[in-house]
Amino acid sequence: MRHRARKTLTALAAAIGLAGIGVSALAQPTATGGPEVMPYAVEDFPHSLQVMSWNMCGPQRSSYHCEGTGTPEDKANVVTTQVAVNRVEAVLLQEVCEDDLTLLMTKLGPGWSKAFDNYQWLNNDGTRKNSRCGEDTGRADRIGTAIVVKGQIIDARTYPTTQPTAGQQTPFHCATASNWDVRLCTVHATRVGANPNNPTQDFRGQQFTEIKTIVDTFPKTVFGGDFNSRSPDDPKNPAPGVWPVGLYSTGPSTPGYQECDQNGSSRTGRPTHTTAATGTTPAIEAKIDYIFSNQTRNWCTVTPTSKSDHSIIIESVTISG
């Protein structure tokens, strides 16, 4: 049953923040990339879990090209707005600065938990250093990925995946949301060109296969993030073979995991990332962010925001008993 958007309740939910939210306000679209209309009221799915995935584009280091995407306060407010309006209860973050994560947790309050793991840079001599949020003379807090959950998390751990022999190292880590007994994992796959010694080297196929092997062991799971790959049925994908058989399903009751924005058997979806235009090239939009689950999908939203070059994805799933 579809519900009409209730503007008064939405405004109230946004105004009062997180404490005492007792309304099922439906999100309203805004010109600045605010919450997209939620297609169902959450009361329709009493055993649901709303999971948000977002590459925050949080670094202040120029190599990440995140200039002009807002302040740490702005980015934290994007998350808390989705919590208040779309009833998000778990968040999978990429490119989040550690101090900004602390700010977000303060805003969310004591009823929330987090798991964080940082990116590292692997030098040619085998030594490692933590990736900084700022330039070498700027912010020194670490940058990485995070899992944020309403309630307690248990068994937070990082799983080994194949990484470049030099250059940026990105973790794959998971944690169990105890309120739902579901395993949540955040992904930031290695982009092509991450190894400065071999810019054509591609680790995505190995990483996706390893991720599939790991999540296949979880009875109930939701995993998502920035996969740095177009979807396998996207005709513009130059390397669809990086997606292993049995990861991305071809529809209900087929092997693999249904993706949040998947429609029928087509393994595609709305764009989630925009590469800015230059003087010689136009802007490029592509779907490279995903949420997968082995639980029943209720609804999915994909919402662009001016606070990152990545859209916000939210999936509501019904958690099996």
Name each region found by the language model.
Residues 2-13, 19-108, 121-124, 321:
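N-terminal, active-site-proximal structural segment of metallo-dependent hydrolase catalytic domains
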Residues 34-36, 40, 215-222, 229-321:
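Metal-dependent phosphoester-hydrolase catalytic domains
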Residues 46-65, 157-159, 174, 181-191:
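Active-site-proximal beta-strand elements of phosphoester/diester hydrolases
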Residues 50-56, 79-105, 148, 175, ...:
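Active-site beta-strand/loop signature of hydrolases that rely on acidic residues for catalysis
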Residues 56-58, 65-67, 98, 132-134, ...:
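Sequence contexts marking disulfide-bonded cysteines in secreted/extracellular proteins
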